[in-house]
């Protein structure tokens, strides 16, 4: 729905505060005089499983249901126009006609790929259509839910779903739901008719009694959540009369269950508190929401025997929610006899430091492996360096917990949001022919199937589907399409178009995927055997690792080559004098030398697998271990590592204790470098003991252990506490030289308040020509004296300034002027003729980096001649893009030659529209 911008209705509130550091996940216990619990024995730690839950799955992701049953006509359950039903098979943004019965009929087709688990896009009842005019779109994707208890009538009934699950189970396939906890359909509106995001710092939540509070202080569920009413929110929520009871369960109809802060800007705080293009963003810090979502999905576990969940928009929900929700769902599933219940989350980031905490702290079993996807595309499609793959796998230790590790990561090459692997191949090599693209596609599949993780086939990729881009352009139906935008899409390995159904089991990619699945099934080490890196070319070329079966001691050498030539590489294996015979991609036989090295040749854009003729030799020397603790005083996610000598196929189990609390198993590392992570609370009291233990176990079952500990030192500068921000209009400082602004000293001066400058509230800088600051006032305050000073303590003006807060809670001041202005001044009009993009690189090197622009750019660029920065500033490079008259969006890509800063197209829009959320 096109958003109409509204002006915020703001209460006058004098109390103003500053946000400090946030609390971490689990508060540690301070050291006591009592004897702390003894560490677990070596034998107990040695029994810790090296693998957990699902590590040998192969997923098939169905977004639009696979088959349209009967003739091309609307489902019988729907009546009305396309804007009422959402059904229009000629429009890619509407329902096309597939349903659960059609998917059930195609189970054998799915099984033929080697599939062990079906992941279905959300099938719960949705709001059929959102938006108007050209912005109208249907909820065919399933992410605009109104009823979390019923199957959407476009897809069928709850009975149809039970039948599908039953038949899939009978064929040996699991079924996973795609679930949402972040938001619901767009039902809640705001009285102000304004949708810009309002931050917590400027507009804190208020209790029913009008006191500001920070909801994050209550998110862990340990404290009673404050009582609130309709006046507690930055935006005043309202629900149309006709929709007051639309949502199911009924608690979802309470507007107080939502954040009510306006539309997300997709960055910073708004990424977790803002509405995604108007979708109602649930207040997941509330215990009612946590408990409500637990009950919703527990019902599906119990009544439908579902095998697991793919969880949408995980990084847009607070971490405390996941810790509680995932723990509760795991416990409930186990209670129902489902010890292998598996949950993986969508954390849309190629940075392992962003994705991994949702496993280690959020307690999910896995995440969708966006870092792998990014590196796999760079290697297989763009001919990038093997070192990028090495870096991704080198971070695998970050996912290790007592119940999970990177072998459970869910790997993929493309999806319903970013686009298909076939699309990326065509984008990365626009002049390439079908044969070359098909070869690169095969290489990408080999990389995904032969490396650690659970691979996902996005429906249609096995038939060579491509597409014009992501989102709607990546959601073609498998049955014959009537959508014009799909009919001209190429399909790799065939001359077929989307005017025909695509269920060809003889298609080249279908046959390749099926063969790779058989290879993994016959050789389980290729699915979840120990993965040890052996070689990574610095540039295009060979990437190699070993996959070793810890039970049989059999080693497999796996090598890939993304170059157009046929190079060779020499690297170590686990055995000296061992013969390795070609198993896949080659008939060659190689033998390792006395130094355990082999030389392997890999054909152009291909992969090979060689299998050892015998077991690894029994270890001669017993293992020894040396443990390395995090630096004293380190907080947050810290690393614990161990050096191991001797043994063979060693694995190291780590455990930690904070204060006098229980010992916790941190997880198992099954190859060097042996590392795990530990979360240390930022508020750990000084003097708290941090104790660590690690046990190494070799292939013969022999063990050795190491222990160490240290005391947490006092924090320099004292402790910080998260404080609530203000609600109301701030003191505004209109400045000609914002960079010179320093702290603002506010409040009635008292002789004993000899504050340091660093403790004064700094000015925040939200927009053009203004900055603002807040400070909490005493109850009953009537006047506020303040100074504006720079970093050296120099005053902005000689005289003290005073605000009469009984008259106003908002004033404007200008540099060098003593006068306070109580009426909002005129601000310079925004320049609508150009877009300004600020780009920052960690290395600070912008040589060769340019901006490719299209869409509403006045002068779209050629890829070979990108727009150059007009200047650099303390943040980074600055690009200025002239826009067309009335411009509403700009598409862009930052790149250096063929190296892209991000793998997918980026876009800016002047106003959000009601397309599906970023999930």
From Swiss-Prot:
<feature type="region of interest" description="Disordered">
    <location>
        <begin position="704"/>
        <end position="729"/>
    </location>
</feature>
<keyword id="KW-0378">Hydrolase</keyword>
<dbReference type="Pfam" id="PF03714">
    <property type="entry name" value="PUD"/>
</dbReference>
<dbReference type="GO" id="GO:0005975">
    <property type="term" value="P:carbohydrate metabolic process"/>
</dbReference>
<dbReference type="Pfam" id="PF00128">
    <property type="entry name" value="Alpha-amylase"/>
</dbReference>
<keyword id="KW-0119">Carbohydrate metabolism</keyword>
<feature type="binding site">
    <location>
        <position position="316"/>
    </location>
    <ligand>
        <name>Ca(2+)</name>
    </ligand>
</feature>
<keyword id="KW-0326">Glycosidase</keyword>
<dbReference type="InterPro" id="IPR006048">
    <property type="entry name" value="A-amylase/branching_C"/>
</dbReference>
<keyword id="KW-0106">Calcium</keyword>
<dbReference type="InterPro" id="IPR013780">
    <property type="entry name" value="Glyco_hydro_b"/>
</dbReference>
<dbReference type="InterPro" id="IPR006047">
    <property type="entry name" value="Glyco_hydro_13_cat_dom"/>
</dbReference>
<keyword id="KW-0479">Metal-binding</keyword>
<comment type="similarity">
    <text>Belongs to the glycosyl hydrolase 13 family.</text>
</comment>
<dbReference type="GO" id="GO:0046872">
    <property type="term" value="F:metal ion binding"/>
</dbReference>
<dbReference type="Pfam" id="PF02806">
    <property type="entry name" value="Alpha-amylase_C"/>
</dbReference>
<feature type="signal peptide">
    <location>
        <begin position="1"/>
        <end position="33"/>
    </location>
</feature>
<feature type="active site" description="Proton donor">
    <location>
        <position position="346"/>
    </location>
</feature>
<feature type="binding site">
    <location>
        <position position="281"/>
    </location>
    <ligand>
        <name>Ca(2+)</name>
    </ligand>
</feature>
<dbReference type="GO" id="GO:0005576">
    <property type="term" value="C:extracellular region"/>
</dbReference>
<dbReference type="InterPro" id="IPR005323">
    <property type="entry name" value="CBM41_pullulanase"/>
</dbReference>
<feature type="site" description="Transition state stabilizer">
    <location>
        <position position="417"/>
    </location>
</feature>
<comment type="subunit">
    <text>Monomer.</text>
</comment>
<dbReference type="InterPro" id="IPR013784">
    <property type="entry name" value="Carb-bd-like_fold"/>
</dbReference>
<feature type="active site" description="Nucleophile">
    <location>
        <position position="312"/>
    </location>
</feature>
<feature type="binding site">
    <location>
        <position position="182"/>
    </location>
    <ligand>
        <name>Ca(2+)</name>
    </ligand>
</feature>
<feature type="compositionally biased region" description="Basic residues">
    <location>
        <begin position="707"/>
        <end position="724"/>
    </location>
</feature>
<dbReference type="InterPro" id="IPR013783">
    <property type="entry name" value="Ig-like_fold"/>
</dbReference>
<keyword id="KW-0964">Secreted</keyword>
<dbReference type="GO" id="GO:0004556">
    <property type="term" value="F:alpha-amylase activity"/>
</dbReference>
<keyword id="KW-0732">Signal</keyword>
<dbReference type="InterPro" id="IPR017853">
    <property type="entry name" value="Glycoside_hydrolase_SF"/>
</dbReference>
<protein>
    <recommendedName>
        <fullName>Alpha-amylase</fullName>
        <ecNumber>3.2.1.1</ecNumber>
    </recommendedName>
</protein>
<dbReference type="GO" id="GO:0030246">
    <property type="term" value="F:carbohydrate binding"/>
</dbReference>
């Amino acid at each position: 729905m096109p958003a109409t911008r509204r002006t915020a209705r703001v209460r006058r509130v004098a109390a103003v505060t500053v946000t400090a550091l946030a609390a971490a996940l689990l508060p540690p216990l301070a050291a006591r005089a009592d004897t702390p619990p003894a560490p677990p024995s070596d034998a107990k730690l040695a029994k810790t499983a090296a693998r957990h839950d699902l590590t040998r799955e192969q997923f098939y992701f169905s977004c639009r249901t696979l088959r349209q049953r009967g003739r091309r006509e609307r489902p019988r359950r729907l009546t009305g126009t396309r804007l009422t039903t959402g059904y229009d098979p000629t429009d890619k943004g509407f329902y096309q006609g597939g349903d659960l019965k059609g998917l059930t009929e195609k189970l054998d087709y799915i099984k033929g790929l080697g599939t062990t688990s079906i992941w279905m896009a959300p099938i719960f009842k949705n709001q059929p259509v959102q938006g108007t005019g050209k912005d109208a779109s249907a909820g065919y994707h399933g992410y605009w839910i109104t009823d979390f208890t019923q199957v959407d009538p476009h897809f069928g009934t709850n009975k149809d779903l039970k039948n599908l699950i039953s038949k899939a189970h009978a064929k040996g396939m699991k079924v996973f739901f795609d679930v949402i906890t972040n938001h619901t359909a767009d039902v809640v509106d705001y009285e102000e008719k304004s949708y810009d995001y309002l931050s917590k710092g400027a507009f804190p939540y208020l209790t029913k009694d009008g006191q500001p509070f920070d909801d994050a202080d209550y998110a862990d569920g340990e404290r009673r959540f404050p009582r609130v009413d309709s006046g507690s929110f930055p935006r005043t929520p309202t629900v149309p009369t006709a929709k007051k009871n639309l949502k199911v369960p009924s608690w979802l109809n309470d507007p107080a269950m939502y954040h009510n802060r306006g539309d997300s800007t997709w960055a910073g705080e708004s990424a977790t508190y803002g509405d995604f293009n108007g979708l109602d963003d649930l207040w997941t810090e509330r215990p009612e929401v946590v408990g409500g979502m637990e009950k919703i999905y527990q019902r599906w576990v119990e009544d439908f025997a579902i095998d697991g969940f793919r969880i949408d928009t995980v990084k847009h929900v607070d971490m405390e929610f996941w810790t509680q929700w995932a723990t509760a769902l795991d416990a409930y599933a186990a209670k129902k006899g489902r010890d292998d219940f598996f949950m993986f989350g969508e954390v849309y980031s190629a940075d392992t430091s962003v994705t991994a905490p949702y496993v280690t702290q959020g307690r999910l079993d896995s995440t969708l492996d966006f870092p792998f996807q990014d590196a796999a595309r760079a290697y297989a499609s763009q001919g990038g360096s093997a070192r990028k793959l090495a870096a991704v796998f080198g971070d695998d230790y970050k996912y290790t917990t007592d119940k999970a590790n990177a072998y459970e990561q869910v790997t993929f090459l493309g999806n319903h949001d970013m686009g298909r692997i076939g699309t990326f191949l065509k984008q990365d090599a626009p002049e390439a022919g079908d044969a070359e693209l098909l070869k690169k596609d095969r290489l990408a599949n080999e990389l995904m199937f032969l490396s650690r993780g659970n691979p996902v086939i996005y429906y249609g990729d096995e038939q060579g589907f491509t597409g014009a881009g992501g989102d709607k352009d990546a959601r073609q139906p498998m049955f014959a399409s009537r959508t014009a935008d799909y009919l001209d899409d190429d399909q790799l390995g065939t001359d077929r178009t989307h005017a025909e159904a695509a269920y060809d089991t003889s298609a080249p990619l279908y046959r390749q995927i099926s063969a790779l699945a058989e290879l993994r099934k016959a050789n389980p080490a290729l699915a979840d055997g120990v993965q040890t890196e052996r070689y990574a070319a610095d540039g295009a070329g060979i990437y190699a690792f070993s996959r070793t079966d810890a039970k049989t001691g059999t080693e497999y050498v796996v090598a890939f080559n993304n170059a157009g030539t046929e190079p060779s590489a020499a690297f170590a294996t686990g055995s000296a004098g061992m013969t390795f015979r070609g198993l896949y991609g080659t008939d060659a036989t190689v033998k390792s030398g006395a130094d355990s090295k082999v030389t392997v040749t890999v054909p152009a854009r291909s992969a090979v697998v060689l299998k050892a003729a015998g077991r690894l030799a029994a270890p001669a020397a017993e293992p020894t271990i040396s443990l390395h603790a995090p630096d004293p005083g380190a907080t947050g996610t810290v690393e614990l590592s161990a050096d191991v000598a001797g043994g063979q196929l060693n694995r190291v189990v780590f455990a930690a204790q904070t204060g006098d609390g229980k010992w916790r198993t941190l997880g198992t590392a099954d190859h060097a470098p042996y590392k795990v992570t530990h979360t240390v609370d930022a508020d750990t009291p000084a003097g708290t003991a941090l104790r660590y233990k690690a046990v190494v176990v070799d292939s013969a079952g022999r063990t050795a252990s190491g222990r160490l500990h240290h005391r947490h030192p006092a924090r320099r500068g004292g402790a910080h506490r998260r404080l609530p921000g203000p609600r109301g209009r701030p003191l505004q400082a209109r400045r000609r030289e914002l960079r010179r602004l320093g702290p603002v000293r506010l409040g009635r001066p008292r002789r004993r308040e000899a504050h340091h400058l660093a403790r004064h509230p700094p000015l925040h800088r939200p927009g053009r020509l203004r900055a603002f600051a807040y400070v909490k006032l005493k109850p009953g305050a009537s006047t506020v004296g303040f100074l504006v000073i720079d970093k050296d303590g120099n005053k902005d003006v000689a005289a003290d300034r005073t605000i009469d807060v009984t008259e106003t809670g908002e004033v404007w001041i200008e540099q060098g002027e003593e006068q306070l202005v109580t009426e909002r001044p005129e601000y310079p009009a925004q320049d609508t003729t150009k877009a300004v993009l600020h780009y920052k690189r960690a290395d600070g090197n912008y040589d060769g980096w340019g901006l490719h622009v299209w869409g509403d750019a006045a002068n779209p660029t050629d890829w070979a001649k990108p727009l150059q920065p007009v200047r650099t500033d303390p943040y980074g490079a600055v690009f200025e893009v002239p826009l067309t008259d009335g411009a509403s969006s700009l598409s862009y890509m930052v790149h250096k030659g063929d190296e892209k800063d991000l793998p997918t197209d980026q876009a800016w829009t002047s106003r959000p529209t009601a397309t599906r959320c970023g999930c």
